């Protein structure tokens, strides 16, 4: 299983710290950077020396929006999986995120296990697009 490099975009320090800890403990992930607003996230992602396999982004940020981060991330020269993790994962918001290039959308309140499974499948070489079936 390959270790994935992840970039986290989350404005809440407590949620960000807990998410980093959970991802690094439960999935083959090393978090290589984080941002709390759109400008910082887009800036980090646009620097050629900063490469990651996975971007996990919240919709509502300290300033700007996760939607702007998604738009910018789809233009990266290196293919990167884009995941939205939000408390506002309504059907309409999920559709909007997928239209903007997100590979998956997870609800913070009840889909953390699904996010961990997604990350494990990615690290194991899966494409993990669309809905996932449980591992037998």
Which residues fall in each region the model found?
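Conserved acidic carboxylate
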Residues: 10
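Two-component/phosphorelay signaling modules centered on CheY-like receiver
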Residues: 13-33
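Short amphipathic alpha-helix used as the core "switch/output" element in two-component signaling
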Residues: 67-78
């Amino acid at each position: 299983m390959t270790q994935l490099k992840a970039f986290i975009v989350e404005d809440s320090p407590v949620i960000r710290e807990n998410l980093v800890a959970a991802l690094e403990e439960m999935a083959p992930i090393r978090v290589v950077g984080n941002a709390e607003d759109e400008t910082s996230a887009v800036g980090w992602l646009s620097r050629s020396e900063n490469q990651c396999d996975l971007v996990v982004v919240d919709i509502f940020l300290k300033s700007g929006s996760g939607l702007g981060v998604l738009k910018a991330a789809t233009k990266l020269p290196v293919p990167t999986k884009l995941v939205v993790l939000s408390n506002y994962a309504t059907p309409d918001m999920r559709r909007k995120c997928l239209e903007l290039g997100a590979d998956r959308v997870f609800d913070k309140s009840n889909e953390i296990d699904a996010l961990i499974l997604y990350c494990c499948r990615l690290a194991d070489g899966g494409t993990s697009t669309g809905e996932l079936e449980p591992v037998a």
